[in-house]
């Protein structure tokens, strides 16, 4: 059986991930006109720029959908977002600012839940709006086939017939109007935006040029913290975790994690927290650039890692960061539910997150400018009295440290001998100032 269909399967049921925008609206109508039987599936991911989800399936039926369903994915999305925080599953960072993999998390949830809904309806062909140059085409491919082994893939944007007839947004708009729908193109922005409850991605068009900065972006989850005319008063916020799970913000508990994440977004968003500019490597190894928002994820991540550093030992923290980066890359590649990812997730959640209980108080200012005001946990291994500089009882004495210095550093003689050995072989040059060999000046290399 062919997995990827290059042309429209006339007379067959096709499920399309339907956003209600021009692209998917025109594609659905075109498929119906050409003799396919389209079904529309819309994921409610709590997009901050979507105000009427119920209207989307109605529009799909107007455009010819045989059936249209709205799938509430918010609970599962937040659950996966919290799991990513517990595991530190983030591998793209620039200057200490993190991309929280919010789009890959959204694709993991959308790709599995929509295809599961299609399977319930006897729909085994899936189409979506991803292009062949991006990451999503592979993410959806993997998650779709993982959920339904009999799935076939049909993407109008890979069909030469569709491209020849409706290759651009202007052609799509004219097609909709010609079919009796008064569909006006929205005003073109200088970039494209994709969002869910966890975060927003701004990319493409003007943002493909590195001399276009965050200043051309209108945040949809935060504020223009770079604009000095925007008043942003400082704000204290307390975040509480129990066994790795965020349970309270400013002492307030929530009926469910969705409400908690919405409140975290509101708090962080008031300051522009979690906004970053990243150059990243796509799955196909080409570099792309995105500007990201994730105010709630950033707030929870900061508090979580503060507790982490106060509770766990150095080796555990090192493994958390190493495995978290590895897991983040798997998530980015559409492998969040693969066995190698599940192994890392289980280890990090079981042995790291389970001990993260406590409260962190922060002062948020502008953008990613914040201070940690207090850290409280019964699980802290940080003990001020162990290293106090004041007189009093101590867990060890000066004599103890003398012994430690002697035993811990017996290799100094070995290291000195190696340095002189490197000098004799020409890897290092002699230094008259210190008496020890030193790394040769690269400018003199080969002279």
From Swiss-Prot:
Pfam families tied to this protein: Arginosuc_syn_C, Arginosuc_synth
Presence of the UniProt keyword Phosphoprotein in the record: no
Native source species: Klebsiella pneumoniae subsp. pneumoniae (strain ATCC 700721 / MGH 78578)
InterPro entries to which the protein is assigned, alphabetical: Arg_succ_synth_type2_subfam (IPR023437), Arginosuc_syn_C (IPR048268), Arginosuc_syn_N (IPR048267), Arginosuc_synth (IPR001518), Arginosuc_synth_CS (IPR018223), Arginosuc_synth_type_1_subfam (IPR023434), AS_cat/multimer_dom_body (IPR024074), AS_multimer_C_tail (IPR024073)
Any one Gene Ontology cellular component term annotated for this protein: cytoplasm
Residues annotated as binding L-citrulline: 99, 135, 139, 192, 201, 203, 280
Enzyme class, first EC level, given as a word: ligase
E.C. designation(s): 6.3.4.5
A molecular function GO annotation: ATP binding
UniProt-annotated location(s): Cytoplasm
Pathway(s) the chain acts in: Amino-acid biosynthesis; L-arginine biosynthesis; L-arginine from L-ornithine and carbamoyl phosphate: step 2/3
Gene name of this polypeptide: argG
Name listed for the protein in its UniProt record: Argininosuccinate synthase
Subunit annotation: Homotetramer.
Residues that hold L-aspartate according to the record: 131, 135-136
Top-level division of the source organism's lineage: Bacteria
Positions bound to ATP: 17-25, 43, 129, 131, 136, 194
Similarity-based family: Belongs to the argininosuccinate synthase family. Type 2 subfamily.
GO biological process terms held by the UniProt record: argininosuccinate metabolic process; L-arginine biosynthetic process; urea cycle
């Amino acid at each position: 059986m062919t997995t990827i269909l290059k042309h429209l399967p006339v007379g067959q049921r096709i499920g399309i991930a339907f956003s209600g925008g021009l692209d998917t609206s025109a594609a659905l109508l075109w498929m119906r006109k050409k003799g396919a039987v389209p079904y529309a599936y819309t994921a409610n991911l709590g997009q901050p720029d979507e105000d009427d989800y119920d209207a989307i399936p109605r529009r799909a039926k107007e455009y010819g959908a045989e059936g249209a369903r709205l799938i509430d994915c918010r609970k599962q999305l937040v659950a996966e977002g919290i799991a990513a925080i517990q595991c530190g599953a983030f591998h793209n960072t620039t200057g200490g600012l993190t991309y929280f993999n919010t789009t890959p998390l959204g694709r993991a949830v959308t790709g599995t839940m929509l295809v599961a809904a299609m399977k319930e309806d006897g729909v085994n062909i899936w189409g979506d709006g991803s292009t062949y140059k991006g990451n999503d085409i592979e993410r959806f491919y993997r998650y779709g086939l993982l959920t339904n082994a009999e799935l076939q893939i049909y993407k109008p944007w890979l069909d030469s017939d569709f491209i020849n007839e409706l290759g651009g947004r202007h052609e799509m708009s004219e097609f909709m109007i010609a079919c009796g729908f008064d569909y006006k193109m929205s005003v073109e922005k200088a970039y494209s935006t994709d969002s869910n409850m966890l975060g927003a991605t701004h990319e493409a068009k003007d943002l493909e040029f590195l001399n276009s900065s965050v200043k051309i972006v209108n945040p949809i989850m935060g504020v223009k913290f770079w604009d000095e005319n925007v008043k942003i008063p400082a704000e204290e916020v307390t975040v509480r975790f129990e066994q790795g799970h965020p349970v309270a913000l400013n002492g307030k508990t929530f009926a469910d994690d969705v409400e908690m994440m919405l409140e975290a977004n509101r708090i962080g968003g008031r300051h522009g927290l979690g906004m970053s500019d990243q150059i990243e490597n796509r799955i196909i190894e080409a570099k792309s650039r995105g500007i990201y928002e994730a105010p709630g994820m950033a707030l929870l991540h900061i508090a979580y890692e503060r507790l982490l550093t106060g509770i766990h030992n150095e080796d555990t923290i090192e493994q958390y960061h190493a495995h978290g980066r590895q897991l983040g890359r798997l998530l980015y590649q559409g492998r969040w539910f693969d066995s190698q990812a599940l192994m890392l997730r289980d280890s990090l959640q079981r042995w790291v997150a389970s001990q993260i209980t406590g409260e962190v108080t922060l002062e948020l200012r502008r953008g990613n400018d914040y201070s940690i005001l207090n850290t409280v946990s019964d699980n802290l291994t940080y003990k001020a009295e162990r290293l106090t500089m004041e007189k009093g009882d101590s867990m060890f004495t000066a004599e103890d440290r003398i012994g430690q210095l002697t035993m811990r550093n017996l290799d100094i003689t070995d290291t000195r001998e190696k340095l002189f050995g490197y000098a004799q072989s020409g890897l290092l040059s002699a230094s008259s100032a210190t008496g020890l060999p030193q790394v040769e000046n690269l400018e003199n290399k080969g002279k």
